[in-house]
Design a protein with these regions (language model features):
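Extracellular/periplasmic carbohydrate-active domains that bind, remodel
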Residues: 2-492
Length: 492
């Protein structure tokens, strides 16, 4: 491996990136102007000490040694008998007794919405499957929820808890949402997922929900549910404390799989998500703090992990960030982004630590994906990633996208600052990294250290970035010149 590129090789590596921006090999003088950075603090290695403190704080809840077998309340594991009432009664009895485990034994149990209560662990034994009804009426009445970053009243998530503490979903069993191209997924409005012209879809309701939020309509009056087409998420824990989701396998969700909202002290461990429908994100903590996601496998139809914090006007109204999150020892297969932040990030996202991750699929677009726009506002800062091995991704290994859905000009430019990536190895990618801010609002403070990108088709792109630090970064066998606080606004 060469110790440094020649000037010819160095320019060759950046030409493809510059061309992608329409800049040619060199940027015009106007692009060389930079603005003073808003942030002066730089990413530092000892930031990882905070990850250790988060891991020390986050502890899964403990449940009393009591068991309530759902079959004792009338549940039947034949796959066709509706066991909703039996499961509901078991949960209420467990809660009233002071807590414990609601046990689903081996068998296939059909159910509608499951609402968890404080001190209750829903435990699926090996061989147990909870199969969720395909009838939308099974998820009524509507509940207080958040749909793509906006608070409203909608169908219940399949498993839901509201303002509870000490709740669990554990065991070796399976949660099967039964969503497919005939149920739930067509509401996306895509022919890929079974929608046909003239069929109902979510588009009008999506627009209406955003307009209601912009107009300040009270959440209690933003009523959807029956007669509307906003798909519920699989698991949503809303304003909860002390949550554990462990061991289960999740299949075929209508939309996002695991969605804690405004919750604190959340552990997601040893979970397998295998769901390839529209917007089938794996785990999306939103406006949460003290979250640990570890030992999980994500094989999804959208982002594997996406950290969120509300959207646009409603995100500014609620104004609660996601922060103090650790992701470690996970496997990522298909999906749009491996570790993603946004696009619903208006309340802000900070102090996210991701380490010891494995990713590889021609259907995984990005390893690290930050997506936002000038409607969102908010911030993404203090993001730290290390020790990540990527076999291949379909697009950019590391993407900062200020142009997600729309570009500049809407008055709420986001702040992206203090990103530190170390020991990232990528075997194949369309582009090594794509870091592009706005001319008037730059990305601020990105450090890449000991990163190797091989078999890269189109180089890399950097524009409108203040304080880019490169140390031992290799692209297609060419070691890029080390930089210290270099203000890069063109492909380097």
């Amino acid at each position: 491996m060469p110790t440094g590129p020649s000037r010819r090789d160095f320019l060759k590596a950046g030409v493809a990136a510059a061309g992608a921006l329409g800049l040619g090999a060199f940027a015009p003088p106007a692009l060389a102007r930079v603005r003073p950075p808003k942030f002066t603090h730089r990413p530092v290695p000892n930031a990882w000490r905070q990850a250790g403190r988060i891991l020390a704080r986050v502890r899964p809840p403990k449940f009393p040694h009591r068991s309530f077998d759902v079959t004792a309340f009338g549940a039947t594991g034949d796959g066709t008998t509706d066991s909703s009432d039996a499961i509901r009664h078991a949960i209420k009895r467990c809660h009233a007794a002071g807590g414990g485990h609601v046990v689903v034994p081996a068998g296939t149990f059909l159910t509608g919405a499951v609402h968890l209560l404080s001190n209750v662990d829903l435990h699926l034994e090996s061989g147990a499957t909870l199969k969720f009804s395909q009838d939308p009426a099974a998820y009524l009445p509507v509940v207080y929820t958040r749909w793509q970053g906006i608070e409203l009243m909608n169908y219940s998530s399949f498993i839901y808890a509201f303002e509870q503490k000490n709740v669990g979903i554990t065991g070796d069993g399976t949660l099967d949402g039964q969503a497919d191209n005939s149920h739930w997924w067509p509401w996306k409005g895509s022919t890929v997922f079974g929608w046909n012209s003239g069929d109902p879809n979510q588009n009008a309701d999506d627009t209406l929900s955003q307009q209601m939020a912009d107009d300040g309509v009270p959440v209690s009056e933003r009523v959807f549910g029956a007669g509307h087409y906003l798909r519920p998420n699989f698991i949503q824990l809303y304003r909860c404390r002390n949550v554990v989701i462990s061991g289960v396998t999740i299949l075929r969700s209508p939309m996002w799989e695991i969605h804690p909202v405004l919750s604190h002290n959340v552990t997601v461990e040893g979970v397998t998500v295998d769901s390839h429908g529209p917007n089938n994100d794996g785990c999306d903590p939103e406006s949460c703090s003290d979250v640990v996601i570890q030992g999980c496998t994500f094989d999804t139809g959208d982002d594997c992990i996406a950290i969120k914090a509300g959207k646009n006007a409603d995100g500014r109204r609620v104004n609660v960030p996601s922060q103090d999150i650790v992701i470690r020892d996970c496997d990522f297969v298909d999906g749009h982004g491996g570790v993603t932040i946004g696009s619903e990030m208006t309340g802000g996202v900070s102090h996210v630590f991701a380490e010891d991750l494995r990713m590889s699929s021609p259907n995984l677009n990005n390893c690290l994906r930050l997506k936002t726009n000038s409607l969102r506002g908010g911030y993404i800062k203090n993001l730290y990633m290390r020790n990540v091995n990527v076999g291949q991704v379909a697009q950019e290994a590391f993407l900062v996208d200020f142009y997600y859905e729309v570009g500049p000009g809407f008055g709420f430019n986001p702040t992206v600052a203090e990103i530190d990536v170390r020991n990232l190895t990528v075997g194949q990618a369309k582009k090594a990294f794509y870091l592009v801010g706005y001319p008037e609002d730059h990305i601020q403070g990105v450090a890449l250290t000991d990163c190797v990108f091989s078999n890269v088709a189109n180089g890399y792109t950097v524009q409108y970035v203040d304080d880019l630090e490169l140390s031992n970064v290799v692209v297609n066998g060419i070691r890029l010149p080390n930089t210290t606080a270099a203000r890069a606004v063109v492909p380097v």
